[in-house]
Amino acid sequence: MYGQNIPRAQFGNRGFGQSGSSSSRRGCGGARLLIGLAMAAFALISYFGSSVYNPITGKDQHINITAEQEVALGLQSAPEMAQQFGGLHPDEQARARVAEIGERIVANSAAAHSQYPFKFHLLADPQTVNAFALPGGQIFITEALYSRLQTEGQLAGVLGHEVGHVVGRHSAEHIAKQQLTQGLTGAVVLSTYDPGDPSSQRTAQIAMVIGQLVNMKFGREDELESDHLGVRFIGEAGYDPRALIGVMRILEEASSGGRPPEFFSTHPNSDTRIAEIEEAIQKQYPGGVPEGLRP
């Protein structure tokens, strides 16, 4: 597409001669390569030079914003996100129930030791089956999903999963990973692109596709980690973690078989998630899930 904006005839009609034009292109190509290498080095140093230990997940993460910045981002985005899904649900009792269960999960789990002021919202959208978390602790569930849940434990499972995204700092990780992949993709595009060589356009396109697929992979890994954290958190709060399996069945039914192939999705398919949840339950409760947990 760039070549269409700068017709090659313009470069061949200035009296420089063929050899001069080739030398000029080689010189420009060398400069582009050096700049591209510098861009790639900066992206790599910025990413791998920012390492933070997460005491709740027990892993080091590459993150370049603070928890306070996450909270500010979430608070800034919350009103607009709520508006996109019809605003807050008019039923105050239903909103209070969501908030109560969410706060119980936070208060009775490892999430209580995080830096985030959690707040739980029920949105009015009756069509979109969804729940999501913004950076810093703003958590939302739509009426379309809320109305499909059959037990309190299933609602706890949805909210616990979203709490997992927050304490897992997945949004902050994603920001850093996007900056890395964009920096590396930009470096490849800059260093390989040549308006006179159509194959360089294909190289640039391939680099961008690879960057997108890498970010999708990160998204799937985040979902699986949040499932594991959800099992842990709702169990700590007194709910039966097997309720999360029921949530997966509900989501699968709501998708009506219209999901994309797993490789091209930011969410793993339901079978994969159910297997991961069962594995997490076995790890959390090697002697079996105890009696008396809320279903």
Where are these regions (language model features)?
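A Zn2+-metalloprotease active-site environment signal
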Residues: Y2-P295
